[in-house]
Amino acid sequence: MATPCIQNAFRRKTLPVRIGDLFVGSEHSIKIQSMTTTATTDVDGTVRQICALQEWGCDIVRVTVQGLREVHACEHIKDRLIQQNISIPLVADIHFFPQAAIHVVDCVDKVRINPGNYVDKRNMFTGKIYSDEQYAHSLEHLMNKFSPLVEKCKRLGKAMRIGVNHGSLSERVTQRYGNTIEGMVYSALEYAEVCVAMDYHDVIFSMKSSNPKVMVAAYRSLAYELDQREWSYPLHLGVTEAGSGTAGIVKSAVGIGTLLSEGLGDTIRCSLTGSPINEIPICIDLLKQTTELSERWGEADNPFAIHSSKQLGTRNTLNTPPWGNVYGLLINLTDVQLLTAEPIELLQCLGIDTTTGKIDPTTPEGVVVPKAMRSSPIVSEIEKHLLVFNKEDAPILNPMNEEEWLSEETLSAPFVYFEVTDIHTARRFFSLRQHSTQPVCLSFSLDPHLSKNEAIIDLSARLGALLLDGLGSCVLLDFVDIKLSRTLGFLILQSANIRSVTVEYVSCPGCGRTLFDLLAVSQRIRERTKHLPGGLKIAVMGCIVNGPGEMADADFGYVGSKPGMIDLYVKHKCVKSCIPIENAEEELVQLLKEHGVWKEPE
């Protein structure tokens, strides 16, 4: 048996950045951070939440600072933390108000700014065109406005995060580069150039998006551009506005897990709607599940190069009628499951209504069964609704045997199963077979000893990393819990922008700017709209500071505009404003009807 040359990743080397009493960077452990949801002016409540976050394992905490009232509150919060011997670094989140950053840096350990709104106006889609002269003048204006903060941070030894958000790029950047990954990267680099020119290097970067595919591509591109310039600054990873529940965990794990597996990332946050405390165990599990990969890190040329399907092999679907040319989901059924399960219960677990024969949108395309069970009554019943494959009809490739990957017997099969044990071996497999057009079914099994969240994170990180690069033709999941298998399978396919079979929800985690009960409203909107067809994306955002920008690719948006009032958006355009919150959900339904996407629940 041949020993494979596994495509290892090493952790990207970075400068150490000091934030309060801790250091961030490649020579230090990956840090977990979160953000308070209390009003920053509620000093008692904010301090209590910060203390709770630290107890749960949070390393860095951020608070929103909208103006001078919040600046003064931060002074009291920091004093209270010092009095209670709480050393967790305090970070101020700044949007639209540079003076708040200048003042608050005196009492916090780090400031976070958004290049899309710190100096320039956020893009309002006016169609304004910047000449080269106007663009150069804007860069000079940026230098003049941003340099006082850089100078003060440098003088006081305070850190800064330059946090770019997809969808909230400035008008100037959007006009030149579009709302693109390139625009995100150059937005960050413009601010980086000011820091470098002023010899200030306590800087961390983030490139967030609610779309994991955009987020991963943006971080890879920024890491490449920074290292081309020998600017080895740390990265903070996050999928912004990931949402709630299992879907939010999947999105975060697909994006963050992919980058961690490539050696990128020095701090992480899972932005889940609800209490920030709920984010911490997910982050802990995510780091735990990527530990095996980190133990494999060794030398490699450029592990975070911008991957593409052209580099690693093309994706060929099985194209089996009535499947068609889609990326399919298969569920493995063992002989034990087929022999012991109640037929009706098994069909229901697969998403088949045994009374009406109706198929759920998250029903897999097919099942894989042992050949000996093919003629059993239960398999015959399944075959009335789904495709059935004999497991023995295609080779199951050993991830540890490279010779088998390229053997004549393997390459002559109509398709193959490849068991994915780790991301780097799978990438090695596709790299060696990059000229092959043979469909590959990615096969995944889960350790039954994992908790539910650990299982979700493990599968999302392993499968998501490959799907984001367009690898494989279909997925075969082999879990005891069949219903969880199909739910996770489609959520991961949706997070990787491969397929969309259900409504996707974008919702922010909440912060001190949030104007309504975000979790409750999100859940109500989900319940009212979850029956709508796949491909639809609805955003629920707590305020207008980040809301309109961070829901960049949502079809419809529900955004808090002021206390008790909601604005409704179609794409990036506000179409109904200042709706009383008690009427807003019904108005959203009416808006969906006006645009022809509403249908009544059955």
Curated annotation (Swiss-Prot):
Protein name: 4-hydroxy-3-methylbut-2-en-1-yl diphosphate synthase (flavodoxin)
Pathway(s) it belongs to: Isoprenoid biosynthesis; isopentenyl diphosphate biosynthesis via DXP pathway; isopentenyl diphosphate from 1-deoxy-D-xylulose 5-phosphate: step 5/6
One Gene Ontology term from the biological process aspect of the record: isopentenyl diphosphate biosynthetic process, methylerythritol 4-phosphate pathway
Tree of life domain: Bacteria
Keyword Oxidoreductase belongs to the record: yes
Residues that bind [4Fe-4S] cluster: 508, 511, 543, 550
Co-factor requirement: [4Fe-4S] cluster
Similarity field: Belongs to the IspG family.
Cofactor binding notes: Binds 1 [4Fe-4S] cluster.
Keyword entries, A-Z: 4Fe-4S, Iron, Iron-sulfur, Isoprene biosynthesis, Metal-binding, Oxidoreductase
GO molecular function annotations of the record: 4 iron, 4 sulfur cluster binding; 4-hydroxy-3-methylbut-2-en-1-yl diphosphate synthase activity (ferredoxin); 4-hydroxy-3-methylbut-2-enyl-diphosphate synthase activity (flavodoxin); iron ion binding
Lineage of the species this protein comes from: Bacteria, Pseudomonadati, Chlamydiota, Chlamydiia, Chlamydiales
Reaction(s) the record says it catalyses: (2E)-4-hydroxy-3-methylbut-2-enyl diphosphate + oxidized [flavodoxin] + H2O + 2 H(+) = 2-C-methyl-D-erythritol 2,4-cyclic diphosphate + reduced [flavodoxin]
Tagged with keyword Cell division: no
Function: Converts 2C-methyl-D-erythritol 2,4-cyclodiphosphate (ME-2,4cPP) into 1-hydroxy-2-methyl-2-(E)-butenyl 4-diphosphate.
